[in-house]
Design a protein with these regions (language model features):
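Structural preference for solvent-exposed beta-strand-turn elements
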Residues: 1-195
């Protein structure tokens, strides 16, 4: 089974996260930030990942540390669950429409971290969530599960819809990238022989 459990304790956050890449989209999320919980539930459902997250953070300050650190832990969990990445497809992409919004997500689980973020969020907040933290989440993820991730908004006016499309699209994208390639079972998907 391709699973991982991560625990991270700092002065700012205490996080427990478990991930099953070959799950059924079951989510049990309690980060202390309702909007992040919603996004992670969508991510898990659309990626068919079983994901459990609990986070106690310094939310009396704001959600920055909690959001970034959950992204870090999710990246670490993907990296651990993938191991040497033997047999995976490696690449994934998805074009996700949601009402007026259209978001393109693509990734290469190459071992080299890069985030291409071309997302224009009209509102600074959705509820009490600072929308700029979505980028911090994905930066935390890609720095701990190194790969190239590109997230590009092609259309959209409603900030909630845009962010929802990002998290759903990344769930679908990573589902494809981590899926097992039956034509190359047991092979590292690189001419270099490692990722």
């Amino acid at each position: 089974m391709r699973t991982a459990s991560i625990q991270r304790d700092t002065r700012e956050t205490q996080i427990k996260l478990s991930l099953n890449l070959d799950g059924a989209g079951k989510a049990d999320i309690a980060t202390g930030c309702g909007f992040l919980d919603h996004m992670l539930e969508l991510f898990a459902r659309h990626g068919d990942f079983d994901l459990s997250v609990t986070c106690r953070g310094d939310t009396q300050v704001d959600y920055h540390h909690s959001v970034e650190d959950v992204g870090i832990c999710l990246g670490k969990a993907f990296q651990e669950a993938l191991g040497d990445k033997r047999g995976i497809v490696r690449y994934g992409q998805f074009l996700l429409p949601m009402d007026e919004t259209l978001v393109l997500c693509a990734c290469d689980l190459s071992g080299r971290d890069y985030l291409g973020w071309a997302v224009d969020l009209p509102a600074a907040k959705v509820g009490d969530f600072d929308t700029e933290l979505a980028k911090e989440f994905w930066l935390g993820f890609v720095r701990n599960c190194p790969g190239s991730i590109h997230i590009r908004q092609l259309a959209g006016e409603n900030t909630h819809h845009i962010l929802e499309a990002v998290f759903k699209g990344m769930g679908r994208t990573l589902k494809e990238a981590v899926s097992l390639d039956p034509g190359h079972a047991g092979e590292i998907p690189s001419t270099k022989g490692l990722l």
